[in-house]
Amino acid sequence: MRHVSYKLKIAIKDAAGLGSISIFRWVEEHLSFRAFYSLLRPIFLVRAALNNAFKKTRPAPALPDFLRTPRTIKTRILQRTDIYLNSVIENFPDRLAAPKWMANCRIEGLAHLQEAQRNGRPVVLAYCHVGPFYVAHFWLRTMGFPVVSLVGGKSAKRTRLARLQDRFCPLPEMPVTLYLDQLRELARFLAAGNLLYMAIDTPTGKQMVVPFCDGWDFQMATGAIRYAIRYQAELIPCSITDEGSWHYRITLGRPVPREHLTAEADWSCAGKHLLGEMLPLFQAHPDQCWDAMTRNLIRKDNHGENR
């Protein structure tokens, strides 16, 4: 009985999701960019307010100076509103190449990707769960870069709704997401000189502690480094910034030097390079990285040891 109830719940969720996809795609097609945004923002603002109405304000944890900005109910509501708005793009990534969307995302550091492609090297794009990270690969694919994201879990767990959304992704001939039980597919994908989009701030898998800023370390997953070594790929830090009103900036930092990408190397050097490239963006937009930083930062005591 429980199994039947679970399947019914999933079916209802998929049906609701399919309905929302159809609605968003219809509205996007028939409204101008400005009208579409103006329609959705007040709706999502109310939804975010209701979502935060009964949540208590938690005491602020100890954090580096650049993250010590007040976390009021208002800031949480606005942040949640932006998440809802940015998630809408997942319903029509195939339309991001249209004139009304294409100018909304600019890429800095594009030369790093282009050089890797000229040299026939695959690329691992290392990112943190900062800003609208969940739409960066859509924009990259829209611009013609064959990128797939790697996530934990098993491929059988990918929902019917997610598979439906995959059909709308640019470059539909290749997968949108690969899982840890699809390493053969991943090997073939990277051997063809493609791009892998992979998080470095997940709590699963092998971990290491990397110096971050004065008095603080960062707990980092080593998967991106290990895959870059295994497949002789360039390891490039990748961040996306929400600049408001569905405008974005993707920043590609300098690739990690090859001497840091060997099995014998001190991998913390690669980790420090990645974080060093990302830190200026974190400092410029603390509101977009607060959640990720509170999960991964480790404070040192006066003797330089981790607490």
Residue ranges with predicted function:
Residues 2-127, 162-163:
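Membrane-anchoring hydrophobic helices of lipid-metabolizing enzymes
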Residues 118, 142, 146-148, 180-307:
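Non-catalytic C-terminal accessory region of glycerolipid acyltransferases
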Residues 11, 100, 123-124, 173, ...:
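Short, contiguous strand/loop micro-motifs
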Residues 76, 119-178, 207:
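Catalytic core of membrane glycerolipid acyltransferases/transacylases, capturing the structured
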Residues 61-63, 139, 164, 227, ...:
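Residues within well-ordered alpha helices
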Residues 103-107, 129-130, 176-180, 217-218, ...:
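A conditional alpha-helix N-cap/helix-loop micro-motif detector
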